[in-house]
Amino acid sequence: MEIQKQINFLPKPNINYEQSNIWDNKKKVYANLFEITLNKEIKLYQYPYKVTPLIEDGDIRIREKLFKTINRKLKEVYGNCFISGNLLYSMKKVEELNNFKCFLYLKGKIEYVMEVNKYEQEKLIRQEDIHKDPLAKQCIELIIKDILHANPKLEFHKDIFVNVKQKQSIETDRVSITFYPGFITSFMETDKGNYLNVTIKNKIFQKGTIYDYIHQFKNLGSKETQKTIREELCKRSFKVVYAKRNYIIDDILFDVNPKTQTINRNSITINLVKYYQEAHGLKIIDEKQPLILVKRSDAQGNPLNLHFVPEFCQLSGLEDDATKDGFFMKELAKRTKLEPSKRVKATNEFISLLEDTEKENEDSLSSKEKMDYYGIKISPLNELFDAYYMKDTKLIGGNNKTVNPSDKTFPILKKKEMINWLCFYEKSNYDDAVKLQKNLDKASKAFGLKVEEPEWIEMPNRASALDWIETADDYFGEGIKREFDFVIFLLGKNDKIYPELKKHSLCTSGYVSQVVKARSMQKKGVLSVCSKILLQINAKLRGISYKVNFSNTVTERKFMVIGVETSRIRQGKKTGVAMVATINDSFTDFFSDEGIIKEENYKEQLQYCVSSFIEKAVEEYKKENNGEKPKGIIIYREGVSLQQKEFLKDEINEIDSICKNRSILYYYILVNTKTTFKFFEKNKQNQYSNPDPGLLIINGVTNRNFFEFYIQPQEVTEGSATPTCFHVAYEYVSCFVIFVIVYVVFKNI
């Protein structure tokens, strides 16, 4: 039997922070953490339980699915409760044995029985337990959730809770949305203790209904149109206007409608038209509209289909068109991008939600009364934490010249001349095309590049994407000898064809392209724009603008750096996988690949996709290094969180096999760019500011159980900076290699 690698994250190593040579400036920073104080003991009751048939300890997903299915029944008997090991914990005393049955649909329908014995003993959670007892974490999380749910001003959307009384609207000619300021909370186990992390999170909804969205499509009876609507809407989040609930769309049903779909209400079968009138006092205007399907399970685990009427549902999130509306995005930024001092103040307003005295009804307790009942107090943590600024290094351009980040021009390290290239432009943008070529030529001299005049391809005004693509195929189509290195598409008012052109370039025909908007040639600073275009094209042609002057300490390790990122493709229920690997010591030459994975066999395809890429990348490295393989591989894996580590089991085993068979050490690092932490510097006037790039947080607020660190990767001039989190997951690494990893991360972000 093949022994699989155990999925356990690396423990935090011992590091002498003061003696490292990769940072030189120690700072104290604020973190958005809150302190929890218990004014009295919390009593928990322990209940042993067993599940039949037995679920193995390794079957975490089955165990989680079982508890999720049975949770409603457990709450009816035990109130707020949680599972830890083979014990159920509750703040409610139950003195009899209880059995809970449910069905799970795994490989067939399986009935499970959870038998919970009467309470075995009591456990007290005290103030000193908060920072050391894992049970205290789950207990406090339940209490905070209970306190927040007592506030009638709050509406809950998965992990986000928003204040419905602070609803705001933004409307432009193209976009109309409502959004609610809100928060996310999570319990953090840090080096200094356990604290509550609170971060601001806004929830955005389309102002129109899903009915409006569906009816913007023509010919709803067409199978092709229905397929497009399903691809656009499935897996999207939505809320109903008549309740504080949100759901995920599983399907759009075009073969049923509110008039034909029935529901059992008080033992009487009625259609949805009558149900909405009786249950919610809502009159359905269009009785023949399609229905939204949400798949759930009942208390026994049996499939339960919920049907919703699009007239009463609103989509959450922004549509793609919204991000193209400059005025809208500016207005949204004004309301949501808070500079550090304002953000700290807004974060601390979380306390007012816990201490709110408004009640749901006369018989219920307010959030403030619940706080008093539990004897809990939550307040902003005033302590500042240690952080370090990493030493800067030189950037080297052509002629071994030092390049400063602020330099607008410099000699390029590895040049790719613009000699054989095409320029597509629309007839009405002729003057812009000429201006583009002249400014590219002018800008090229400062970089030491050569730019010759392109072959011009003039397209008719308002030509379709298909017209542009068919013309491009004359030069880059299958079986045609390629005489041109790349193409620039200059787009005017028809810039909506951008996605089709990039798809044709990258996925269909495989040629290098650069899309330029004609209006960028009509503004001030055209020369600066063309300088940036030149650098982008040079990079796409495998040129190198400059390199980091790494010390021998780094380059002699002969690392290969690999990045893997997954991203869901809304249309077609697919996931895109992008992979890139460095294949030289200076980390300036690359090998890349991509994959498209279907949802139905996502896990199997993904592990093959990643492992296959690593095998190819190692061979490419050997080609560039006289047959020598890399001594170590650092893999940065984005798209999977620490909490989803079991999902990585098969992927890790594949990578482990590939690397061990080739005697290559590897370091597998999870990357999370959407962290809930905010780190700010604080001055003597109690004003907060964003940190500069290169800030490293490697202790203090990091998880005490795992090896993780945070880096502020870029300069932020608007709003608040968000750090990137790195979990060094696998293999064993020495402290020396730890510093090399941190160093390489920062210099390659």
Regions found by a protein language model. Give the residues of each.
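N-terminal leader/early-domain signal
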Residues: M1, I252-P258, T269, K274-H280, ...
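A residue-level signal for conserved active-site and pocket-lining positions in enzyme catalytic cores
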Residues: Y276, C423, I635
